[in-house]
């Protein structure tokens, strides 16, 4: 079973090697930043590393909460899910597969997991007990426009649905071959919920009905909970937390930077270690 803090440590050690060879961090600042419709350039290893150091800890436990809910629902409703197929769309580093590993006690037999992403991410799982898995360099557009058929019973969007076009999402239900599936979507931003509306309308137009099983919206700051308290787990490593927060100190040219405030805003931020960004929905979809 994954030890999340060991995973964070491994990424941090690699990231430090990258930083040791950089005189300035201007490129990292611009390539790794979310703003407007700009998505970080995940083709670059350093961007993957910084993204995971900031968000992997919280995302793994958010997805664990989602899978735990799903498996408990199956147990209560006597649903036999052994041997099921899971499709993770926009899988990235496979964080939801690590989350599945944390739910290992729910899995009696083999589950088949497929992750697709246009980018071949590093830091993906190498071995997960009771789960057969594979990753493909593939985007949703190719999946829904080629002669593909989807037999997966669970379709997971890990913070990724906002990255896909409405046209591609509309085609997804036409590829579904199972009579009942479960849609699990974690939203990176509240505005991404509009993409869900498009997807659900397409399911209805293609002969499906849906039932919302769980809907967790983003909470206010005053209601956030530290994940290590919530789940009785190790806290995010303090030394790495402090380092990431003062990342701009690693820039050798920070003293002559023309826009130090911009550097602070884009580089210097704490990793997420609370449930403040938990924002997801789980839906049962049935063919009629």
Each model region followed by its residue ranges:
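Phosphate/oxyanion-binding active-site loops and adjacent basic polyanion-contact surfaces
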Residues: 52-67, 92-96, 120-122, 165
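Conserved class I S-adenosyl-L-methionine
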Residues: 82-92
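Class I SAM-dependent methyltransferase Rossmann-like catalytic core
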Residues: 37-77
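Conserved SAM-binding loop of SAM-dependent methyltransferases across substrates and taxa
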Residues: 93-108
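Short, conserved SAM-binding/catalytic segment
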Residues: 122-134
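Domain-level detector for long C-terminal conserved domains
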Residues: 2-3, 137-288
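Conserved SAM-binding motif I beta-strand of class I
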Residues: 112-117
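N-terminal auxiliary segments of SAM/dcSAM-dependent transferases
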Residues: 1-34
